[in-house]
Amino acid sequence: MEQIILNILKALRCGETVDDKALVKLIHAEARREGADKRDLAKRRLLPFYQRVKREDPARWAAWNVDSDLERQLLQVLRMKPRRTASGVATITVITKPWPCSGDCLFCPNDLRMPKSYLHAEPACARAEQNCFDPYLQVSARLTALSQMGHATDKIELIVLGGTWSDYPQGYQTWFMSELFRALNDDAVAGVAANPMLARPGISRAEAGRLLDDAPADALPPVVAERRERYRAAGIAIDEAELAAGVADEQERVDAAVGGYNRAVRRLYGPGTPWGEVTEWQTATMEELERQQHINETAKHRVVGLVIETRPDAVTPQALTLIRRLGCTKIQMGIQSLDQYLLDINERRISVGQIERAFSLARLFGFKIHAHFMLNLLGATPEGDKRDYERFMTEGAFMPDEVKVYP
C-alpha cells in the first residue's frame, strides 16, 4: 500500500492529474506486481493507511517528504465520495430507538426492529442498530467514517430521525441531544484498528459490528468502549440472527394485524426487558445539555444545524419551545398530502387546517421546514397528485424550504 502512496506523490510532484481512473490504474498495477487482491489495495483503505503512518510512524512519514500543499493534493485524490461535504458541512444522520408512535398511518411499515416507519435494512438504520441506537456511538461511528474518507468535519449538521420526536419522553429527548453534542465535543474518532470494514474485503456490516467489540482497547474512544460494554452487559443484541429472532414472534403477529405495532414495541422494549433496563439511565437534565452546547461553541466539530422529525399535529408552542432549547434549527414534517379525503382514507388522523397551523407556528419560532410529500397514496390519481403538489409549492400557507417526495 505504501508503494501506491509513493506513486501518487510522484505523479503529483510531476504535475500529473491523478483522477479516479488514474488511481485505479495505479492500484491494479501494484496488485499485479505484488500478486495481491485488488480489494486489499482499494481506495477506501489508502487514506486510513496514510493517516495511520503519519500518526504512528512519523519517521516513515517524514521520509515521504510531504509538505502541506502536496498533502492537500493527496487528500483530494484519496477522499471518498467528495460530494458528501461539497457544501463545507458534513451531515451525520442518527436514529432514535423503537418507541410507540402516536400515529397509525396506513402506509407506514411496522418493522419492530426500528422506530415506526423505518426499515432495518436501510443503511442509517442498520448502523443505528449496530450501535444500539445510542446517539454517542452513532456519532462516533460516522465521525470515524468521515475522517477515514478524508472529509472535513469541523462543521456538522445532525439529522435525528425515528418518527415523531415529541412522542419520546422529555428526559430521553434531552439525553439524546446531550449525547450527540458530547460525542462531537469529545472528538470521538476511533482508530483504523477499530474499523473492520477496512481490515477485510467484503465484510458485512453485521460482522463488522461483532468484530468491533474485539477491537484493541486503545483504538476506541473511552466512552465508546464503556458504552458498548454497558449495552452488552444489559443483554442488548447486535448480532443479525439474534436481532431477527428476538422480534420474530411479535413481528408475525403484527404482520397478521394482531395487536399492532405499539403493543408489540412495549412488550419488546418496555419494563422487564433489556431495553427497559437501559431506558432507566437514558435521561439527562437540561443543564447538562446546555453545558454540552456551550462547550460545542468552540469544539473541533461544531454543530451548525440540527434537525428533528415530527407530525403536524405534534407541532405546538410548547413542543417548539422545547425543540428550540434542545438546539434544533430545522424540522422535518410529514405532510404527505393536502387532500383531506386522501388523509382520511390513509388514516393520517390530521386535517389540512392542522398542517397550515403547524407551518405557521414553525415559521413563527424560526425553524426551517423540510416537508415530506407522498404520491400514489391509496385513493390518489396522477392528476390529483399534480394539483395537490402544485398547491403545496405555490400557496403561501405552505411552500416549505425543502421537500422530499416519496413515490
Question: What are the language-model segments listed below?
Answer:
Residues 96, 303-315, 378-383:
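Active-site mouth loops of central-metabolism enzymes
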Residues 1-138, 142-281:
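Flexible, acidic/Gly-rich N-terminal and inter-domain linker regions that tether
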Residues 326-330, 353-407:
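Conserved C-terminal portion of the radical SAM core fold
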Residues 139, 173, 316, 355, ...:
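Aromatic/hydrophobic pocket-lining residues that form the small-molecule binding cavity
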Residues 313, 318-344:
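Active-site-adjacent "gating/activation" loops or surface patches in catalytic cores
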Residues 105, 160, 308, 323, ...:
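Conserved, mostly hydrophobic/aromatic
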Residues 180, 184-185, 231, 285-300, ...:
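Alpha-helix-loop-beta-strand connector modules within alpha/beta enzyme cores
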Residues 162-166, 310-314, 337-339, 373-379, ...:
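Active-site-proximal loop/turn and secondary-structure-junction residues that shape catalytic pockets
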